[in-house]
Amino acid sequence: ESSSVQAAIDIYGLSDLNQIDSGYPEEIKKLHESEGSPEALWVNGPSLNGEHNADGRKKFSEANPINYIDKAIPPFLLMHGDADKSVSPDQTKILHEALIKAGANSTRYVVKNAEHGGIYWAQPKVNKIIIEFLNGVLKK
């Protein structure tokens, strides 16, 4: 049996760090421009020299999952909450559109009122979507 990845599930994940604040109001966009923002810490590590997002765009591009999509990619299930204030729901939309453009199988759900984590992600409806996706892909 193959050990290659046969299915992928992305729940409120990042896809393009250069557009991390897409769809957010200005006050949230400003938070993403700081050297202490989660994405700046993820890519640059703790900043001792004042490097932040505006300085690290090349690093951000190299870390973007959308830059590594090819035709051999497995089916994707993308889920995001429309009330997520940590990662913009546009992130799964960007990835979904890039996957479709590359000819991959991608399904995206937006969960109403769901934030980044929390009780909304433990709903039976969400679990059912995930189980049905995995059964549909892995039990063929």
Annotate each PLM feature.
Residues 1-27, 136:
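Primarily recognizes the serine-hydrolase "nucleophile elbow" in alpha/beta-hydrolase
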Residues 22-68, 101:
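Mobile cap/lid helix-loop segments that gate and shape the active-site cleft of serine hydrolases
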Residues 72, 77-80, 84:
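Short beta-strand/loop motif that positions the catalytic acidic residue
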Residues 85-94:
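Conserved alpha/beta-hydrolase "acid-adjacent" motif
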Residues 123-140:
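Catalytic active-site module of serine/aspartate enzymes centered on a nucleophile-bearing elbow/loop
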